[in-house]
Amino acid sequence: MHELSYATSILNSILEVLKEQESLGKKVTGVSEINLEIGDLTLISFEQLKFAFEVIAENTLCKNAVLNTEMIKPKISCLNCGFLGILEVTDELEAKCPKCGSMNVRIKGGKEFNIKNAIIEFDD
């Protein structure tokens, strides 16, 4: 379950930002939302990621944070027929050109895992 390591990475990154904000004299009261970009080729189960995050964030300022995700589709270029487009990811992890069926392709993207932004709540 590699989702736990991803969830831990998210939590540690956000807690580091909260620590920085507090060192600037700001009173952080919580995090309400964390927005992620996740590539389809990471094969991360978003439901498992959310569950793992909820468990490890339980006693932190992130305990009420909602995780949102934007899934990033990989792009494919066929070296055989010149097709450029989106690669539809299946469980088989075959990278075939949807136009000619060739496996002589290049894949760009789809492996992203980024924290796009987070909504941090402060005490005025």
UniProtKB/Swiss-Prot annotation:
Superkingdom to which the source organism belongs: Archaea
Gene Ontology terms describing biological process: protein maturation; protein modification process
UniProt xrefs under InterPro entries: HypA/HybF (IPR000688)
Pfam family, one: HypA
Keywords: Metal-binding, Nickel, Zinc
Disulphides: none
Binding positions (Zn(2+)): C78, C81, C97, C100
One GO MF term attached to the UniProt entry: nickel cation binding
Positions annotated to bind Ni(2+): H2
Annotated function: Involved in the maturation of [NiFe] hydrogenases. Required for nickel insertion into the metal center of the hydrogenase.
UniProt family annotation: Belongs to the HypA/HybF family.
Name of protein: Hydrogenase maturation factor HypA
Gene name, Swiss-Prot/TrEMBL: hypA
